[in-house]
Each structure stands twice: as structure tokens, then as C-alpha cells.
């Protein structure tokens, strides 16, 4: 059952990049992110209420939510959505798979109990070679939109890595769904007024495919995905759950190719193999 849930989670998160690619064709980035965070927050509030849980009132916890909601929600969601205006959804899902590699590097310098080993060093090198292969065409062309889009996705991975490290100590002892709700709430607080002030999306009229993709991204890719994610953690372990990292880019690449006719070039496939090998090594 846990394996089935893990496969479903990988499929859902892999499809998120497809939905984002469809949405950014018509919807401003900040509006996309603000709408996603707002609807997801309201849905998780409802889940908390029906389950008898509630958000904490501790100022210390809300300071943590404020930091993690910015670095782990508002910023990476915006970077991913902005980046996908210029690169394929499959490439975005693949570059996002570098998160565990960044986590290993940051953990070595920011924690006392996670030291880097030779296997992890090799994994980091292999993973970054994979990233370099993917970004080489853009580097040859200079700082164009394609390269900046790739850098935005890599930046979001760095944000997620930092969030994972600090969340362990700052949110220790908190029920996972409560923590997720707190972070989403603060992400909404940041992005909703920002969107209203900058995008002014008052007369926005998205097409039906874009609206459907936005709803699926929010409900399926955020709310349902979080519920499944924390269910797996409760039933098995965090280590088992992190195996989803291997599933997401494969699904993302396949969906991009099948739905949007994105090309699976030898460069992309080579980068996929090296990044996943790097992730495997840093987890040994």
C-alpha cells in the first residue's frame, strides 16, 4: 500500500510541472502562485478543522512558519513558475531533482550530525555534472531567457534544501499537516497582496484548459499531495518517502513528451541518468 501511495505521489508531483507550463501561457506568475497558495491554504484549514486539529498560537512557531513559508513556499513556487515560461516542463522537473544534492551540501555546513562522506562527495560531483550537461547549451548562448529559466529552477531546489534542514529543528514535534498548513498560510500572506498589487488580475479570463490545470495543480498537486506525503511518512519513514525524488522527474519528462510534445533529447536523458545517480550516491 505504501509503495502504491509513493507511486501516486510521484505521478502527482511530476504532473505539477505540466500544469504549471500550461498555466503560465495565460496567467501571470504571481497570480498563479498566489491563487495556488490561497486555495490550498483554505483546503488544508478545512482538513485541520474536520480532523479536530488547529494551528498553534505560539509566536515562536509563527516566526518559523513565516521564514519557511517565504523560503519554502513563496520563493520556490515563484521561481518554478517563472522559470517554466522559458524552459520545458520536463527539464524543470529534472532540475528540481537536484534538491537532495543541495541538501547534503548545506547539511554539512549547517548541522552537527550530518557530515559529508566520500560517497556523498562523488554523488554531488556526478549530480552537478548532470546539471552542467543540461545547462551547457544555454551557457554557450550567454545569459538568455532559457538559461535564466534553468537557474530559477535550480534556485528553487536550493530553497527547498534549506527549508528541509531548518524545518527539522524549527518544527520538531509539530504534526506534519499542521506544519504544512502554517507554512502555506504564511506563503499566502506574502503572495496574495503581492499579486494584487503587481499583477492586478481583476479582469483575468483564463481559458478552460488553464483554469482546469490551475485547479488540478492546487487541489491535486498541493493539497492531495501533502496529505499523501504525510500519510506515507506516518506509515513508513521519511527515508522511504524521499524515494519519490526518483519518480518525479521520470513522470515529468514523460508527461511533457506525451502531452506537450517536448523532445527527449540525448542531452536530457544523459542529464537524467547522472542526476538520479548523484541522488542515489548522496543517500548512501
What are these regions (language model features)?
Residues 1-33, 82, 142-169, 190-191:
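Glycine-/small-residue-enriched transmembrane alpha-helix faces in small-molecule transporters
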Residues 14, 18, 45, 69-74, ...:
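Hydrophobic/small/kink-forming positions within alpha-helical transmembrane segments
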Residues 35, 73, 92-98, 165-189, ...:
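Helix-helix packing/entry segments at the starts of transmembrane helices
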Residues 46-55, 100-125, 250-270:
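C-terminal transmembrane-helix exit sites in multi-pass transporters
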